[in-house]
From Swiss-Prot:
The PRC barrel domain binds ribosomal protein uS19. GO terms for biological process: ribosomal small subunit biogenesis; rRNA processing. GO terms for cellular component: cytoplasm; ribosome. It is found in: Cytoplasm. Keywords: Chaperone, Cytoplasm, Ribosome biogenesis, rRNA processing. GO terms for molecular function: ribosome binding. The gene is rimM. It comes from the Bacteria. This is Ribosome maturation factor RimM. Residues 112-184 form the PRC barrel domain. It holds the Pfam family RimM. Belongs to the RimM family.
Length: 184
């Protein structure tokens, strides 16, 4: 099976260590609710660490290896998965540091007025005065709520960090790639 295009693969976490003796790996997910990672039937691993790839450099196609997922579960805030073909601790340890990617079309459907953070990236942020604040270039969590980073996408320069809460976010229109904010 071939990998989807690079634009369709979403990084969801990284392998932090081996789990047990039977080849399972422990993944440090980027999200506190890693539903897409837990439900995926296959994942792609990249052994190029993010710091070496550079922030503007996507995962290289040649560095990707696809694995079928035999099982996945939550354990102490991490995701533990068993990958087909990884059968012992030494094989699992060799994958330490690998980035975990999943095809975007493999994500479970979300309810109305719910969004995957990845779908917000690239949206234009507009305030109530209809002024463009910039483009959403990143989304993070601070423990209490999501935070969208708005700025210049070409330079990755952040101009605003805006809480993603209903008091601030007035509307999200993914079809038009816009987010209306009560923000100056």
């Amino acid at each position: 099976m071939s990998a989807p295009s690079l634009n369709d693969l979403i990084e969801l976490g990284a392998i932090s260590e081996a789990q047990g003796l039977r080849g399972q790996v422990k993944i440090r997910p980027h999200s506190s609710e890693p539903v897409a990672l837990l439900s995926s039937k296959s994942v792609w691993l990249s052994l190029i660490p993010r710091r070496d790839a550079g922030l503007s450099s996507p995962v290289e196609q040649a560095s990707l290896t696809q694995y079928k997922v035999k099982s996945a579960k939550m354990h102490s805030g991490n995701v533990v998965i068993a990958l087909e073909g990884v059968t012992d601790r030494d094989q699992a340890l060799a994958l330490k540091g690998a980035r975990i990617l999943v095809a975007r079309d493999a994500f479970p459907k979300v309810e109305t007025d719910s969004y995957y953070w990845i779908d917000l990236i690239g949206c234009n942020a507009i305030n109530l005065q209809n002024e463009t604040l910039g483009e959403v270039i990143d989304v993070t969590e601070n423990g209490a709520h999501g935070v969208i980073a708005i700025g210049d996408a070409s330079t990755k320069t952040i101009q605003y960090l805006v809480p993603f809460v209903k008091q601030v976010v007035q509307d999200v229109d993914l079809s038009n790639k816009t987010i209306s904010l009560d923000w100056q």
